[in-house]
Regions:
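Conserved beta-strand/loop scaffold segments within soluble protein domains that form the structured core
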Residues: 1-185, 189-192, 206-208, 213-226
Length: 226
């Protein structure tokens, strides 16, 4: 396992290079909760035949925060999963870019990305699946959900598929929604304060993507106090 804690108070660029040999496996858990400064975090990963990689990414927006996850399948029968949960508080920004480059046969990628934006927060997600002509038998799935919880939020989502082979299984989807005012009204009518209601809804929305070995600390940092 690789546990990565990215907490940079000032402006910073953090680069992580991972090269996985044949039939290797890695669970990569990353927490990045600093909300001040401008940050750029890049992860490059190259997977040889039979390698298996899982990333559990937990992140809060900062003055400007961009994360790039670049996965290159250089060997057949390799698998990569990117599971990410993010929150953006007032006047904070988060930009997550994920590229899965399938250049060899029978490779598999799964992206599951969930973001919650609070008042005046801004979040962007761009997920790209690229399958080359000779990469037959690939399976690539992308699911992205974003929730606006407050006024004046900005949410951008752009899932992309670029496929040059017919013998593949691929799907991608992105949904953007606002917090259900009916739910809020019901909860407040039962004596639950608005701040606590927002916390409950946020925790329910991010339940599936706060995962992996650092999930306990991620929950305490990403979910607002009740």
């Amino acid at each position: 396992e690789l546990h990565e804690f990215v907490d940079c108070e000032n402006n910073a660029a953090v680069m992580t290079w991972i090269k996985m040999g044949e039939n290797s496996s890695l669970i990569h858990a990353r927490n990045s909760f600093q909300e001040t400064g401008k940050h750029w975090q890049v992860t490059f990963n190259e997977l040889e035949s039979g390698a298996s990689y899982t990333m559990h990414n937990h992140v809060k927006g900062s003055e400007t925060k961009r994360q790039d996850v670049l996965i290159n399948f250089t060997g057949s029968d390799s698998t990569a999963r990117v599971i990410s949960a993010g929150t953006v508080n007032k006047d904070r920004k988060l930009d997550l870019q994920v590229i899965c480059d399938h250049s060899t046969p029978r490779t598999t990628s799964h992206q599951r990305i969930d973001h919650v934006a609070f008042e005046n927060g801004s979040t962007t997600f761009n997920g790209r699946i690229h399958i080359l002509e000779h990469a037959s038998g690939c399976n690539a799935q992308l699911k992205n959900r974003s929730l606006a919880m407050g006024s004046e939020t900005t949410i951008n989502a752009k899932p992309e598929l670029e496929i040059y082979n017919d013998d593949v299984q691929c799907s991608h989807g992105s949904t953007i929604g606002q917090v259900d005012e009916t739910q809020l009204f019901y909860m407040r009518s039962r004596g639950i304060k608005q701040k606590e209601a927002h916390s409950i809804l946020c925790e329910g929305f991010l339940r599936e993507t706060i995962s992996g070995p650092l999930s306990a600390s991620a929950t305490s940092n990403l979910i607002p106090e009740r």
